[in-house]
Amino acid sequence: MSHDVHIIGGGLAGSEAAWQLARRGVKVRLSEMRGSGEMTHAHQTDGLAELVCSNSFRSDDDTKNAVGLLHYEMRALDSLVMRAGEVAQVPAGSAMAVDRDVFSAEVQKTLEAHPNIEVVRERVDALPEAGLTIVSTGPLTAQSLAESIVKATGQERLAFFDAIAPIVHRDSIDMSKCWIQSRWNKRTEASNEDGDYINCPMTKEQYLAFHQGLIDGEKTEFREWEKDTPYFDGCMPIEIMAARGVETLRYGPMKGVGLDNPYDTSEEHPQGRWPYAVVQLRQDNKLGTLWNMVGFQTKLKYGAQVELFRTIPGLENAEFARLGGLHRNTFLNSPMVLDRQLRLKGAEHIRFAGQVTGCEGYVESAAVGLMAGMMTAKELAGDVWQGPPRTTALGALLSHITGDAEAETYQPMNINFGLFPPLHEVKKKQRKEAYTTRAKSDLGEWIAHEVRVSA
């Protein structure tokens, strides 16, 4: 099939961009390296839009949470990623989490069935010299293409590190020591009856021993060329967090507040005391057979992981479907090398989208892919792109990536209200809701005036 646009990379951003283009009548060639005999060291399958790190799209609260607002805005623009996420949704309290396999399969099925999309399993080693192109190769860009990008952008480095959390088989968890509950008993329509997290409590003595085990455990060594590569805080390995101080984890992923331990009750606390520390597991698939260890991204060696994690109450006989790991991410200094439409300065036929632009997170990656698809469709139609207002989550994210961030200190960024034009006149308690109310109103006006789709 001849094509109007070539998309390189079939992750979240590339898949979303392909969908947005195809539903506007644009012919798309979607090149994905996996399935051609090539594989990254972090992916497990050759499925489109595979989720490598967590299975969570984070908060789905569109009234007081920035990523929840981004969910809302993407749904308003018929996002394939959000549509597939709803098909694959699993219970996760007030968050949105998905069954990885169901999600990837839904995205792939939808794209392969679309007459305007041709999915081609091939590795692309260099940036095309001509033709409208969207590069959405993500954090695991092949070395040859990364070198081509470095040459085209004049950058010295494109990389930082992410860590992956372990996944445990549900039937290997000893529920006589754990209980199911969401923090503060928060629920959503997708929630399980009792709650959405398995909680493994720790006493002070157990926590201190576990903390020391994280410090002492044997860790993956970096190769020489990797040693100066920084971490992104959003996927900070738990042992790195532990090294920051003995209390750091107790105020982070292992905090016990809002969780009532039914095995530690008293007259004063009939529902149970809050544990000194806790390890939480979140459902990872629709069947409920796999649960991931929340916040437990790690670069401990496999043997050290098994030994240490089996000291956690309830996980003494844990069987791991996947152990934690470390992978290298790739991103551009986008404020320096991209224009306001995500085009590479000096080679404007090429757009970048997704995590390679320096946005961080599944939803953010897909959102940038969505906008790249819309921009490219507008360009093909000979129309002028008027981007979403900066007061929206989409507009705030795009503005940050394409020029509002400081180029000298640019780092991967999740969507957050700090990227929005401030509302200083609104009291702090009402400010988050004011941001989302303003965004929804402005998005509605933008869609009415700018978004014309013949799907």
Curated annotation (Swiss-Prot):
GO terms for biological process: tRNA methylation; tRNA wobble uridine modification. Its cofactor is FAD. It holds the Pfam family GIDA. Belongs to the MnmG family. TrmFO subfamily. It comes from the Bacteria. It catalyses: uridine(54) in tRNA + (6R)-5,10-methylene-5,6,7,8-tetrahydrofolate + NADH + H(+) = 5-methyluridine(54) in tRNA + (6S)-5,6,7,8-tetrahydrofolate + NAD(+); uridine(54) in tRNA + (6R)-5,10-methylene-5,6,7,8-tetrahydrofolate + NADPH + H(+) = 5-methyluridine(54) in tRNA + (6S)-5,6,7,8-tetrahydrofolate + NADP(+). The keyword Transferase applies. GO terms for cellular component: cytosol. This is Methylenetetrahydrofolate--tRNA-(uracil-5-)-methyltransferase TrmFO. It is an enzyme of class 2 (transferase). SUPFAM superfamilies: FAD/NAD(P)-binding domain. It is found in: Cytoplasm. FAD binds at residues 9-14. Keywords: Cytoplasm, FAD, Flavoprotein, Methyltransferase, NAD, NADP, Transferase, tRNA processing. One of its GO terms (molecular function) is flavin adenine dinucleotide binding. Its main location: cytoplasm. Its EC number is 2.1.1.74. Catalyzes the folate-dependent formation of 5-methyl-uridine at position 54 (M-5-U54) in all tRNAs. PANTHER family: GLUCOSE INHIBITED DIVISION PROTEIN A, METHYLENETETRAHYDROFOLATE--TRNA-(URACIL-5-)-METHYLTRANSFERASE TRMFO. HAMAP family: TrmFO.
